[in-house]
């Protein structure tokens, strides 16, 4: 992995924490660097309560590191939450599942209205805020649609739509499929297709 995320506090903002993602760009290929820049471009263009907020980005260490300052979602992600419930052998309350599902759909709707396909919706990319809300994050492989359908086979196998698996052209429906897989996972505490 090229990146690590740190919890940081700016001196002028006592008590306010941010997530600071450090990306070692010195060892990246061109395509991987393009993904990192893409995440900044997309995050900086969107402001939505269910998408991780963007604050700043800068280069450091003689331009070998890219740092992205984002909203802190200090309660982990849906993958860790599902795992905690699975270990307890206890299911999530239906109201919590519905709340998370609706918030994911609203965040996804915002992306899609901006013609952005996330392409890697999965439990580990849905973050939990202190207020209990969920936020879509990790937009590095997201793609802004420019008319033609997408063709690159990308994402996480458990959440890939049939058209992505079959290497066929796809669009926003691939994200909708992935959110459906997540809804199933929140209810059953396991991905639908294993």
Range-by-range predicted roles:
Residues 4:
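Conserved N-lobe ATP-binding subsite of Hanks-type protein kinase domains
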Residues 61-71, 79-80:
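A conserved loop-to-beta-strand element in the N-lobe of protein kinase catalytic cores
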Residues 175:
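Conserved catalytic-loop aspartate of Hanks-type protein kinases
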Residues 56-58:
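A short, aromatic-enriched beta-strand patch in the conserved N-lobe beta-sheet
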Residues 17, 22-47:
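Conserved N-lobe beta3->alphaC-helix segment of eukaryotic protein kinase catalytic domains
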Residues 100-101:
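Activation segment signature within eukaryotic-like protein kinase domains
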